Amino acid sequence: MFKDITPLLLDAAALAATVDQLAEHAAPLDVDVVVAAEARGFVLGGALAARIGAGFIPARKPGKLPADTSSVEYALEYGVDALEVHRDALGGGARVLVHDDLLATGGTAAAVCELVERAGAEVAACSFVMELGFLDGRSRLEGHAVHSLIAYGS
């Protein structure tokens, strides 16, 4: 099942309301930074970070960041992928909100959480616009608070 957020992005009022709702949940977490996965996580992750007064760190595909990076590989349904962050982006003790547009199997979000924790930072919560509950991605994020605005199936 493919879910597309681009119609949401086209509607200025819906986009603003989405960022508002994500921020309403995230603001009390008192995070230092939002770390979002490439590529669709960037779209709302940066806006969310700005709204709650936090920094933003992109978790990118290999070879896309110019400085020293930390990386983690993770399994996909059809192979293996990897994500990287700048090695010096996360300080020990930082509180982090992990954000992506969609929680499906949980592999991408779990990889971002691993990058955050390897750096000595704390995952305060994971935030998503949509969740495909029937794929049970939450089980890959056990031990982390998970919030999604919309959930399909369970």
Label each PLM-derived region with a short phrase.
Residues 1-154:
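PRPP-associated nucleotide enzymes
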